[in-house]
């Protein structure tokens, strides 16, 4: 095996291991430590509390959001569930959106990602977007939906490649708090 392939193989195995841990019930409630993060923006979604977190430059902001009408991890197209895992923003969409349903902008996620495909998950069209009206908990068809004023605030930070971590329960803690526990 050529030397250049080793780092990519190690990264791929590490990513699969992390994604596999999300199948373990104890790993589903995880804690993100925000201290010392690089300058990259990271978003996280706590489905149980209907919260969207935006972490950047060592600071965390949170917003009300809504996720799928049916609880649990998305498995198949049309199950009305929001997937759980690590996804990335693929692109921003502003053209031909039904304002009442999607607001004025949508950020397309890479669901299903390679790990989802290995697990046999189907479906597509999982976005982070807003609505032309106020949101209520657990009302989406699987997307992560924020209020219009909130998507206007976080949208500029949701660039292509931004990771979006979605889990049943997500805790945001400083490194100091995490070490104390």
Task: Annotate the PLM regions.
Residues 1-8:
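N-terminal secretory signal peptides that target proteins for export/translocation
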Residues 12-22:
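Bacterial N-terminal signal peptides
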Residues 23-29:
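Sec/Tat signal peptide C-region and signal peptidase I cleavage site
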Residues 30-42, 66-79, 85-93, 148-149:
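N-terminal post-signal-peptidase region of extra-cytosolic proteins
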Residues 32-38, 81, 93-181:
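Exported/periplasmic cell-wall-interacting domains
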Residues 52:
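Gly/Thr-rich phosphate-binding beta-strand-loop-beta motif of the actin/hexokinase/Hsp70
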Residues 55-59:
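Short acidic-glycine loop/turn motifs at beta-strand connectors
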